[in-house]
Amino acid sequence: MTDLSDIRREYAKGGLRRADLPQNPMDLFELWMTQARDAELSDPTAMCVATVDEHGQPFQRIVLLKRFDDTGFVFFTNLGSRKAQQIAANNKVSLHFPWHPLERQVSVLGEAQALSTAEVLKYFMTRPKDSQIAAWVSQQSSKLSARQVLEGKFFEMKAKFAKGDVPLPSFWGGYLVRPSSIEFWQGGEHRLHDRFIYTRHDAEWEIDRLAP
């Protein structure tokens, strides 16, 4: 077994105080996202999306956040993917944003709601053309005999859609994750980290400090 117990560091970039918290957690998330982007972090919109299968087995994968507002967090995916199939059976999900260089994390619990075709199409048409074509090519989470099969299909579809717009695949969609709780974590000295959790009660948010 590889021993990693001596890998550690101190957290000293600043604290998080109750008096500094807005009543709406999305306001704090917007501030932290802006600061993550301004710090030029690698993939600041990358989030870990966790779902659970019918046996209670959790699965995680990195997905890019594409939009957020007071209603929640939006991402897009292949509707035949494992994550989409699991969401169809159990729409309770969690999201996690690991902004390590800023010594920050944000964890979200909520329910995923499918977006309308109009909303999906609006975003799909903003994607680069090669990305639109790739959406047609990949049967996400299915087994492949070789990468060449995938590449061959890509170039075949690229030739097919050489002229004109790429249509939206019927098996491609998106989700809005409506949060029931959002936790903000800020690293602190001596492992005395600051953790605050916002919990939704109807239209109001309750704020609690959690022990590190």
Curated annotation (Swiss-Prot):
Binding positions (substrate): 8-11, 66, 123, 127, 131, 191-193
Pathway where it operates: Cofactor metabolism; pyridoxal 5'-phosphate salvage; pyridoxal 5'-phosphate from pyridoxamine 5'-phosphate: step 1/1; Cofactor metabolism; pyridoxal 5'-phosphate salvage; pyridoxal 5'-phosphate from pyridoxine 5'-phosphate: step 1/1
Alphabetical keyword list: Flavoprotein, FMN, Oxidoreductase, Pyridoxine biosynthesis
Gene Ontology MF annotations: FMN binding; pyridoxamine phosphate oxidase activity
Protein's name according to its UniProt entry: Pyridoxine/pyridoxamine 5'-phosphate oxidase
Family of the protein in this entry: Belongs to the pyridoxamine 5'-phosphate oxidase family.
One GO term (biological process): pyridoxine biosynthetic process
One Pfam family from the record: PNP_phzG_C
Residues the record lists as binding FMN: 61-66, 76-77, 82-83, 105, 140-141, 185, 195
Gene3D superfamilies linked: Electron Transport, Fmn-binding Protein, Chain A
EC number: 1.4.3.5
HAMAP family per UniProt: PdxH
SUPFAM superfamilies: FMN-binding split barrel (SSF50475)
PANTHER family: PYRIDOXINE-5'-PHOSPHATE OXIDASE (PTHR10851:SF0), PYRIDOXINE-5-PHOSPHATE OXIDASE (PTHR10851)
